[in-house]
Amino acid sequence: MMETAADALASGTVPLEMTQTQIFEAIQGDTLLASSLWINIALAGLSILLFVYMGRNLEDPRAQLIFVATLMVPLVSISSYTGLVSGLTVSFLEMPAGHALAGQEVLTPWGRYLTWALSTPMILVALGLLAGSNATKLFTAVTADIGMCVTGLAAALTTSSYLLRWVWYVISCAFFVVVLYVLLAEWAEDAEVAGTAEIFNTLKLLTVVLWLGYPIFWALGAEGLAVLDVAVTSWAYSGMDIVAKYLFAFLLLRWVVDNERTVAGMAAGLGAPLARCAPADD
């Protein structure tokens, strides 16, 4: 039974009557799929320990806030990937007419959207603070990002209409365009003023290039065109998560630790450089 379920998972389909326990056993029976999840749990755990050690001596409030934001990334990931590997946040949905797997129950690891909805805003908070951005731009980026993740989840869970799955996908991509605009235009200018352009541009490019991969693999995976099976898509997502989250957070936190005085001198508040703060009247 377990081998049959594992084979079904590898092909992107599972029988409708599978329980959570059976899904868990089937995931463990698919080496490619299981390894894509367990490796993230392991790396997230190591990242948490490393980041706590790296940020232990930070004293500036802005630097500490960046540290907390970066630390939240692996904390969210380890929770989410544990949910995935246990089968708790994995379901199987019958694909609508028009889908390449129409009528089949397709494995849907919707727990990934929980990861993205909680971790990617933390990445943006850290980047916004690094750029010296104001609260309005930060709020815009974070809310658009959450909208992107929620509508992406809607695309994955919609089974009533194949067309509506793609409508949700387009809406999600529209939110993504807003995030890209803030990153590439608004925050790039802010970072120049703040004097953090070099590290910001490195992290910006890393983020943009990798984040562009997520909608591409969604479209190619079982949730979209079904060109790639579930295990391959899972590894694609996991690989991008490793670089876009753990490596990103490490590079940012290392820079903040080495340049805490620069961070401390950037602003008294979001988007308010110290040099521009007028003294209070006597």
UniProtKB/Swiss-Prot annotation:
Cytoplasmic side: 56-61, 132-134, 185-196, 259-282
Pfam families tied to this protein: Bac_rhodopsin (PF01036)
Topology versus the membrane: Multi-pass membrane protein
Nucleus listed as a keyword: no
Keyword Protease: no
Taxonomic superkingdom: Archaea
Residue intervals passing through the bilayer: 30-55, 62-85, 110-131, 135-158, 162-184, 197-220, 230-258
Signal peptide limits: none
Alphabetical UniProt keywords: Cell membrane, Chloride, Chromophore, Ion transport, Membrane, Photoreceptor protein, Receptor, Retinal protein, Sensory transduction, Transmembrane, Transmembrane helix, Transport
UniProt GO BP: phototransduction
One Gene Ontology MF term: photoreceptor activity
Family: Belongs to the archaeal/bacterial/fungal opsin family.
Job of this protein: Light-driven chloride pump.
Protein name as annotated: Halorhodopsin
Organism: Halorubrum sodomense
